[in-house]
């Protein structure tokens, strides 16, 4: 199982984020931007969720906090146009990483956005990451199925896995959908986004089960 994130051999690496609203997608992008900025990479964000009031501003705020550039247009703009501008900018100005936010309810738009990216960078997007809220259990599984039907999801970002993590959902996603979990969000802090380590996770899950039985 491939839990690692894939990067471009040369030129910008593009990660496309999908998922319904309210699962922590934009927050995940902000945290990942922080991680790569700390590693010394040049990071660009694309505000492709142009339909939700506040989504553009939320991403712009993350850009300010982290200190990275954000490509955005006014609300109700065509998301594909935003992403096109971002991809062109990433290529021309030698960005290492481009993280693309998308609207939650427009799964049909995701493929259009992907085509825009691939036209400019043939092997991109290098990851299509589906954000799921770990606390929603079966609902998360249903969402994953819906997104997997319309677009080629390459991995899962599991958010809100802090505290008494309902971790069984990870196993369900892996078993039913054959999708690797690549990142987990463990809290609200900037560095609370971790690479998913299956072994560590299984040990944690087992400990949780043992504790419950006592």
What are these regions (language model features)?
Residues 22, 50-51, 109, 136:
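Short acidic/polar alpha-helix capping motifs at helix-coil junctions
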Residues 25, 49, 101, 133, ...:
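Acidic active-site catalytic centers that drive phospho-/nucleotidyl reactions
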Residues 58, 78-93, 107-212:
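Conserved catalytic-core segment of NTP-binding enzymes
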Residues 1-48, 55-78, 82-91, 97-100:
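Primarily NTPase-proximal linker/entry elements flanking Walker-type ATP/GTP-binding cores
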Residues 103-105:
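Short glycine-rich anion-binding loops that position phosphate/pyrophosphate groups of nucleotides
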């Amino acid at each position: 199982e491939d839990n690692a994130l894939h990067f471009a051999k040369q030129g910008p690496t593009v990660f496309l984020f999908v998922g319904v609203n309210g699962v922590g997608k934009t927050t995940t992008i902000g945290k990942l931007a922080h991680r790569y900025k700390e590693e010394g990479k040049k990071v660009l964000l694309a505000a492709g969720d142009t339909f939700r009031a506040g989504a553009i501003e939320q991403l712009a705020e993350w850009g300010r906090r982290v200190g990275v550039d954000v490509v955005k247009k006014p609300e109700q703009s065509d998301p594909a146009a935003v992403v096109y501008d971002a991809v062109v900018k990433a290529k021309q100005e030698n960005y290492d990483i481009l993280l693309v936010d998308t609207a939650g309810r427009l799964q049909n738009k995701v493929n259009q956005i992907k085509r825009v990216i691939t036209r400019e960078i043939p092997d991109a997007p290098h990851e299509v990451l589906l954000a799921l809220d770990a606390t929603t259990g079966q609902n998360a599984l249903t969402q994953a199925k819906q997104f997997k039907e319309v677009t080629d999801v390459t991995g899962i970002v599991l958010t809100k896995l802090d505290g008494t993590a309902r971790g069984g959902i990870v196993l369900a996603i892996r078993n039913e959908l054959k999708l690797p979990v690549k990142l987990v969000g463990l809290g609200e802090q900037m560095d609370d986004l971790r690479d998913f380590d299956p072994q560590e996770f299984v040990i944690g899950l087992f400990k949780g089960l043992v504790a419950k039985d006592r």
